[in-house]
Regions:
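Metalloprotease/metallohydrolase-associated module, dominated by Zn2+-dependent proteases
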Residues: 142-169, 185-228
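Active-site-flanking alpha-helical
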Residues: 179, 183-184
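Sec-dependent N-terminal signal peptides
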Residues: 6-11
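Fold-level signature of zinc-dependent metallopeptidase catalytic domains
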Residues: 38-57
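Metzincin-family zinc-dependent endopeptidase catalytic domain
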Residues: 55, 59, 63-173, 185
Length: 228
């Protein structure tokens, strides 16, 4: 896999309107934070429970991600996808990330922590999972509440359940941010049913079920380029 840039070229964000701004891994028993010697996809996806996000919840998300990524990455053997997603050890969000006036955690600070945890290893994409409210500053608004944030391209994402209306939306937001980390931008067609549509300050994930044809083609080109 072609090495990812050490300097992050962009950050992708999901917004929501109405804001100022013990156990073992399923399929990877005892893996913890260790990595497969030769990741079949060229990288692995680590789901990192943060704070009160439980290991069990992360395992449930993992099962859904394996299923959905198997559809999105349909050219890859299912066993490759199964072997490439694991639940890592729980971490606490650093107190330095807390913005006390709104009781929100700066998403950028969480990304920095996740990026540094593996020393910038571009063979692992770490997705932090939290129930806490997260935020960033964008469009002239300071500390704007968001659902997710990722480096694009990069090795870290963070997703929050705080603004999600349905449990089923979690895998959708997670895949949205993960695909940003692979370099996929927002849907250029602005297709309401596409997982990569910009949220436009609204939570419309209940309407989304997959990628539009344009985003599928863009992802194929990105993956082909990274595999050279």
């Amino acid at each position: 896999m072609k090495k990812l840039l050490l300097f992050i070229t962009g950050i992708s964000i999901l917004f929501l309107a109405g804001c100022s701004n013990g156990n073992q891994s399923h399929g990877n028993e005892g893996m913890g934070d260790s990595l497969p010697a030769d990741p079949p996809l060229g990288y692995v996806i680590e789901l990192k429970p943060l704070g009160k996000f439980s290991h069990q919840e992360a395992e449930q998300l993992r099962e859904e991600l394996v299923k959905q990524l198997g559809i999105i990455l349909y050219t890859k053997p299912k066993a490759w996808v199964e072997a490439s997603v694991f639940v890592g050890d729980k971490r606490e969000i650093p107190a330095s990330c807390l913005y006390k006036p709104r009781n929100r955690y700066w998403a950028g600070g969480i990304l920095k922590m996740l990026h540094e945890e593996h020393g910038g290893n571009d063979e692992i994409v770490t997705i932090g999972l939290t129930h806490r409210d997260i935020s960033t500053s964008i469009h002239g608004q300071y500390n704007y509440g968001i659902m997710g944030l990722s480096f694009r391209p990069g090795d870290a994402c963070v997703v929050s359940t705080f603004r999600l209306k349905r449990k089923d939306d979690l895998w959708k937001v997670t895949i949205h941010e993960f695909l940003h980390s692979r370099g996929l931008p927002h849907c250029k067609k602005d297709d309401l049913k596409c997982l990569m549509q910009d949220a436009h300050s609204k939570n419309t994930f209940y309407m989304k079920h997959g990628l539009c044809e344009d985003c599928k083609n863009s992802l194929r080109m990105i993956m082909a380029h990274q595999e050279r």
